[in-house]
From Swiss-Prot:
Gene3D superfamilies, A to Z: FHIPEP family, domain 1, FHIPEP family, domain 3, FHIPEP family, domain 4
Function: Required for formation of the rod structure of the flagellar apparatus. Together with FliI and FliH, may constitute the export apparatus of flagellin.
Annotated compartments: Cell inner membrane
Alphabetical UniProt keywords: Bacterial flagellum biogenesis, Bacterial flagellum protein export, Cell inner membrane, Cell membrane, Membrane, Protein transport, Transmembrane, Transmembrane helix, Transport
Regions crossing the membrane: 24-44, 45-65, 71-91, 121-141, 209-229, 247-267, 296-316, 478-498
UniProt-listed PANTHER family: FLAGELLAR BIOSYNTHESIS PROTEIN FLHA-RELATED (PTHR30161:SF1), FLAGELLAR EXPORT PROTEIN, MEMBRANE FLHA SUBUNIT-RELATED (PTHR30161)
Family, similarity comment: Belongs to the FHIPEP (flagella/HR/invasion proteins export pore) family.
GO terms for cellular component: plasma membrane
Membrane topology label: Multi-pass membrane protein
Name of the protein this chain belongs to: Flagellar biosynthesis protein FlhA
An example Gene Ontology biological process: bacterial-type flagellum assembly
Domain of life: Bacteria
Stored NCBIfam families: FlhA
Length: 696
């Protein structure tokens, strides 16, 4: 007995168990069994009672649900309950036809009760009641709910693109985070699936009502044939017995069907609020005392008409008038009015104390636009700038190896109407102008002729440009100008600024998130690396040094392997950066020179190189004249390199690379300083020009 109890014991935590997985298959098996196997009357009583209880539960859940998606399983439940009722009809029909001649209890006590007590044992009344229930279910509730579900599905599908764009806009504006955006997108998808399912599920109920009417006719006709032909019953006795059993069977199935249809109507007609259906009805029906008073007045007039049931009308008149008077007094009582006035005065005179919520943290990256540029960042007005910026962030992450911060875009009345500002931590790092509806014609250096328009400079690279009207677009292209839209101008400028400040935008939080991301892919390599082998601060500084010189950090495996090899003996971030750069020599060479076998670089004179090495080893600085001369010669070499179509790269001794890079970075940010150890094998190096110090 104890073993049996232990076998039958259900798990305590149903949600974490696998018992729920069996619910669907068990129910399907039960339905098929009822259709195929003959059931005893007692089991039919249990199943009919279970069907009624299930329908009441579904209706109550629909009533207490606050949002439609809180009962997203309703279409599936509707299908299962419909199949359950039909299978019960099949099982009860079988037992009525087989055992109906034995008496009214042949199909169980539940069918007998519905056939006798609820309709007084009169099969004519039972047929009328049954037909009325079917008409209510089929013509009123089901038809209305089906139409609402159809229209709701159409509107939900039509509104999906707008909802998705609104979610993307909120995400790009920083109003919500990525997790909230995923949650909202999932809800939009679930809502669409729900109303689409409800549109089809409503057909189940309509078909169930039609099937119930046909089963009634089949049972009556079949019962007469079986009773008279097989059991030699009198026609009147057969008609009375089988009709009452059929009516009981029909009523015990149609009443749950009516309840389920009502639940479907409640689900599709409700509006999502913080209240359930009952609270909405009570709050909105009985909150206005004038409505109750007017209703009481109309009922009172009807109650005074001769021949009317005066007591009933006057009773409800008094009840509604009393309720209206009570609500009116409650709304207009001195205490309530005084409380409202006090709250209003307190609200006006309240001194709001400063709190930590008033401290506004600066966004890592943001953009402010003038009011004429607002349509460009508004998805509802077909603005495409948000999508372009999202694409730039994704491309940057793929190329440089980390995801930059979300760009918070806002309008600012202090910014000129057609201007914009790009800010990093609240400080402007770029600005420009854009004119929606016009085109920017950029002169790449080989354009011929002039164009009518507003002369300006392209904000990203400072090239001469002209804002032109759409009518001059083709002419500008023919003359050799590069013509771009206003949104492209801003997007290109933003991309340039993003790459320019890649190192400063890479903070400790980004370093931690990147390390966590790598840890998921390479758990053995990253195990015990931080903080046992090196600190997060050192890793952050090394990666920041790489980004400061436009070196991508995509190859984190190579970076971490180099750090793991040298970090135990070396803790200086600058020295570790040099080691990592050598390990990344293939990526660095590929980044600056592509697949070219011959690479053209700017060289450093051997004499100047020895002089710089001696100065570095002795700790002394360079003479001002020599430093100025090196800077000027580097500038001339970069110009010649760019005019010849080459990449501005200075190749120096490995020991001098870091020093010269820091020295030349401010005046020549476009110049990349590489060491001879950072060039991958198999590349032929050709010096196009030489920086020779004072003797050049």
């Amino acid at each position: 007995m104890a073993n049996l109890a232990s076998l039958l014991r259900l798990p305590g935590n149903w949600k974490s168990s696998q018992w729920q997985i069996l619910a669907g298959p068990v129910l399907i098996l039960l339905i098929l069994s009822m259709m195929v196997l003959p059931l005893p009357p007692f089991l039919l009583d249990l199943l009919f009672t279970f069907n009624i209880a299930l329908s009441i539960m579904v209706l109550l859940v629909a009533m207490f649900t606050r949002r439609t998606l809180d009962f997203a399983a309703f279409p599936t439940i509707l299908l299962f309950t419909t199949l359950l009722r039909l299978s019960l009809n099949v099982a009860s029909t079988r037992i009525i036809l087989m055992e109906g001649h034995t008496g009214s209890a042949a199909a169980g006590r539940v069918v007998e009760a519905f056939g006798h007590f609820l309709v007084g044992g009169n099969f004519a009344i039972g047929i009328v009641v049954f037909i009325i229930l079917i008409l209510i279910n089929f013509m009123v509730i089901t038809k209305g709910a089906g139409r609402i579900a159809e229209v709701g599905a159409r509107f939900v599908l039509d509104g999906m693109p707008g909802k998705q764009m609104a979610i993307d806009a909120d995400l790009n504006a920083g109003i919500i985070n990525e997790e909230e955006a995923k949650k909202r997108r999932k809800e939009v998808s679930l809502e669409s699936d729900f109303y689409g399912s409800m549109d089809g599920a409503s057909k189940f109920v309509r078909g169930d009502a039609i099937a119930g009417l046909m089963i009634l006719v089949i049972n009556v006709v079949g019962g007469l044939v079986v009773g008279v032909a097989q059991h030699n019953m009198a026609l009147n006795d057969a008609a009375s017995t089988y009709t009452l059993l059929t009516i009981g069977d029909g009523l015990v199935a149609q009443i749950p069907a009516l309840i389920i249809s009502t639940a479907a109507g409640v689900i599709v007609t409700r509006v999502a609020t913080d209240e359930d259906v009952g609270q909405q009805m009570v709050t909105q029906l009985f909150d206005n005392p004038r409505v109750l008073m007017l209703t009481a007045g109309v009922l009172g007039l009807l109650g005074l008409v001769p021949g009317m049931p005066n007591f009933v009308f006057l009773f409800f008149t008094a009840a509604l008038a009393g309720l209206g008077w009570y609500i009116l007094k409650r709304h207009s009582s001195p205490q309530v009015q005084q409380q409202k006035e006090l709250e209003q005065v307190e609200k006006q005179n309240r001194v709001v104390e400063a709190s930590w919520e008033d401290v506004q943290l600066e966004d890592p990256l943001s953009m402010e636009v003038g009011y004429r540029l607002i349509p460009m960042v508004d998805n509802r007005q077909n603005g495409e700038l948000l999508g372009r910026i999202s694409g730039i962030r994704k491309k940057f992450a793929q190329e440089m190896g980390y995801l930059p911060p979300v760009v918070h875009i806002r309008d600012n009345m202090e910014v000129k109407p057609s201007s914009y500002r790009i800010l990093m931590k609240g400080v402007e790092i770029g600005h420009g102008e854009a004119h929606p509806g016009r085109w920017l014609a950029i002169n790449p250096g080989n354009a011929v002729g002039t164009l009518e328009g507003d002369n300006t400079q392209e904000p990203a690279f400072g090239l001469p440009a002209v804002w032109i009207d759409d009518s001059l677009r083709e002419q500008a292209q023919v003359q050799g100008y590069t013509v771009v839209a206003a949104s492209t101008v801003i997007a290109t400028h933003f991309n340039h600024v993003l790459n320019q400040y890649a190192a400063e935008l890479f903070g400790r939080q980004e370093a931690q998130m990147l390390f966590d991301r790598v840890s998921k892919e390479l758990p053995k390599m990253t195990e015990n690396m931080i903080p046992d082998m090196l600190s997060l601060t050192v890793l952050h500084k090394v990666l920041q040094n790489l980004l400061a010189e436009q070196v991508p950090i995509r190859d984190m495996r190579t970076i971490l392997e180099a750090l793991a090899e040298h970090a135990p003996e070396q803790k200086d971030p600058a020295e570790l950066t040099a080691v990592v750069r050598v390990a990344l020599r293939r990526a660095i060479t590929q980044h600056w020179f592509g697949d070219k076998e011959e690479i053209q670089v700017i060289g450093l004179d051997a004499g100047l190189e020895r002089l710089l090495l001696q100065a570095m080893q002795s700790g002394g600085g360079l003479e001002p004249g020599l430093a100025e001369n090196i800077e000027q010669q580097a500038l001339d070499a970069v110009r010649r390199q760019e005019m010849s179509g080459g990449v501005p790269v200075l190749l120096v001794n490995h020991a001098l690379r870091s020093l010269l890079s820091r020295f030349l970075r401010r005046s020549l940010p476009q110049l990349a300083v590489l060491s001879n150890m950072e060039i991958s094998e198999g590349r032929h190096i050709r010096m196009t020009s030489m920086i020779g110090g004072q003797n050049n």
